[in-house]
Curated annotation (Swiss-Prot):
One Gene Ontology molecular-function label: structural molecule activity
Xref: InterPro entries: Satellite_virus_coat_sf (IPR037164)
UniProtKB keywords: Capsid protein, Virion
GO cellular component term of the entry, any: viral capsid
Note: This virus depends on tobacco mosaic virus for its replication.
Recorded superkingdom: Viruses
Subcellular location: Virion
Entry protein name: Coat protein
Organism, as annotated: Satellite tobacco mosaic virus
Length: 159
């Protein structure tokens, strides 16, 4: 695996065989000392190359997941890696602040619990200009101009 990429560690927890925890668990904020379970949701999207490596404002990376039988979710950690083209066997690391959507409301959501129904989504906007270096900004994922893929890992605690 490339430097900076987190390797998922599959772990059996009874009936939740698809539960994934991250090896770097120590880097997560302790928002809930006794979580029901934590799931890391990998999500990859290809960056469409447009004119001068631009994508429309409002383009969204999103991860939708089922949350049946849970009343709240806490986003514990959000991380992203951008894979450069040509490949250099390395991912550039970015920490993002997510937008958490429940119903019609959208709010900044990290390290706090929120009541949810049966579906939740975490989204990320990317700006128009992709020529700059990879930086982290509020609710925005900026990628380098030679980036072709973005991988997101969202670690959530469901209660």
């Amino acid at each position: 695996m490339g430097r900076g990429k987190v390797k998922p560690n599959r772990k059996s927890t009874g009936d939740n065989s698809n539960v994934v925890t991250m090896i770097r668990a120590g880097s997560y904020p302790k928002v809930n000392p006794t979580p029901t379970w934590v799931r890391a949701i990998p999500f990859e999207v290809s960056v469409q190359s447009g004119i001068a490596f631009k994508v429309p404002v409002g383009s969204l990376f999103s991860a939708n997941f089922r949350t049946d039988s849970f009343t709240s979710v806490t986003v514990m950690s959000v991380r992203a890696w951008t894979q450069l083209t040509p490949p250099v066997n390395e991912y550039s690391f970015v920490r993002l602040k997510p937008l958490f959507k429940t119903g019609d409301s959208t709010e900044e959501f990290e390290g706090r619990a929120s009541n949810i129904n049966t579906r939740a989504s975490v989204g990320y906007r990317i700006p128009t200009n992709l020529r700059q270096n990879t930086v982290a900004a509020d609710n925005v994922c900026e990628v380098r101009s030679n980036c072709r893929q973005v991988a997101l890992v969202i670690s959530c605690c469901f209660n």
